[in-house]
Amino acid sequence: MENVCGWIAQAGSAPQGARLSSAQKADWLVIGAGITGLSAAHTLAALHPQARIIVVDRQRAAQGASARNSGFVVAHEHPAHSELIGEPGFAGFEVDTAISRAASDEVRQRIARHAIDCDFRDSGYYFAVNDRAKLDHVDAKLATLRALGARAEFLQGAALAQKLGTRHYQAAIWCGQGNALLQPAKYVKGLLNALPGSITLYEDTDISGLERLSHGRLRANSVDGSIEAKQVLVCLNAFVPRVGIADTATFPMELSASLTRPLTEQEFQAIGAVEPWGVLSTRPLGATVRLTPDRRVMIRNTAEYRTRDLSNGELTLRRQHHVRGLQRRFPFLGESDIQYTWTGHLSASRSGQAYFDRVEEGVFAVAGCNGSGVARGTLWGRLLAELASGIDSPLLQSVMHRAEPGWLPPRPLFDIGAMLRMRVEAVRARTEI
């Protein structure tokens, strides 16, 4: 089957950018034209209006992982037991929430500044479960979320079904005041289209490595060209190692999702003509589900650590998993109702924290979105550009202080451990797919 992202297909085509085919020089080079890289490029252009800035991507700009995620703008995450008020992890959770709220605000500011039409809905979303046991300590979670500025409500049974149009979910915490939904491909395409004319973009340009030249500048090499720059920002998240930065303590995960055709008017009325919504599971491998403004259902219920990308045949099997998840929620939907199925990647870490650092003189990198790439990627791009420009702030200090992704064992031990952990989590989440 064909791997086609429904978000990208709906965002519409864009003119093909040039491919690097010569030696170029720049003041700034940004590697990666996703949310983080484009946010960084916008910030650099504002801070250094006379500088020459080049952005490169190994594929079409704004069509990588940033366009393929589920479109959740995360300001408030579901707190673990150790992060509740009165528990040892609350102080760290409080700092992380302040960062996430700033990131959510950054998304809103970008959308307003560049007039990006991306189906943005500032309506919150749900942490919902089929198995009531997987949503515990409800009162403490509500108190924790509210103490950190969220609006949070507990729903169950008929009241929840009335909101979602399905009786699959038995209990949920709705969380707003910063949490939002958008169409990710439209958002990142909007960032791309708003780049100032002073920025040069090269697409389909795979940077294979960085080398330090004798006079201190850096050269990024591709098959048919090179770019010499004073400063380099590496915004590749899961794929930072491709340019030779190996020690980020982060790792890639491959996810798959499907998007249905729009519901018919009869189907829409049958589920109660509900407002668009988004659901995140309380389990790491539980399903992420959305009902979009154009009445489609999106489901993402596979996440894997792999040493190679899924083949089309393997994606067909994942699509069957999507079908089972759809039919648990909306029995009238089957495989023939799926219009798009695709894969995407995220960058994860053992601790859930990012890698955000000055790698060496003139080289700055970020990785480890841990599933919150829309908001955090937007903020990280700005802060990475500010760090590289010598601009400090309390927010930047908070991000750098929390940027401890944790130690990973060497391969192949890590490969074995990660795959076993994924299997265990899949079993734990079996009621939530």
List the predicted regions and their residue ranges.
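Glycine-rich active-site loop/strand segments that organize a redox cofactor
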Residues: 64, 68-99
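Glycine-rich Rossmann-fold phosphate-binding loop(s) that bind the pyrophosphate
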Residues: 32-36, 58
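Flavin (FAD/FMN) cofactor-binding and adjacent substrate-gating region
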Residues: 2-10, 79-85, 109-190
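Helical element adjacent to the flavin cofactor pocket in flavoenzyme catalytic cores
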Residues: 136, 143-144, 171-230
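Active-site substrate-recognition segment that forms the wall
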Residues: 113-121, 207-209, 215-216, 226-266, ...
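C-terminal catalytic lobe of FAD-dependent flavoproteins
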Residues: 305-426, 430
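Glycine-rich FAD pyrophosphate-binding loop
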Residues: 45-68
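Extreme N-terminal leader/targeting segments of oxidoreductases
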Residues: 1-28, 46-47, 51-52
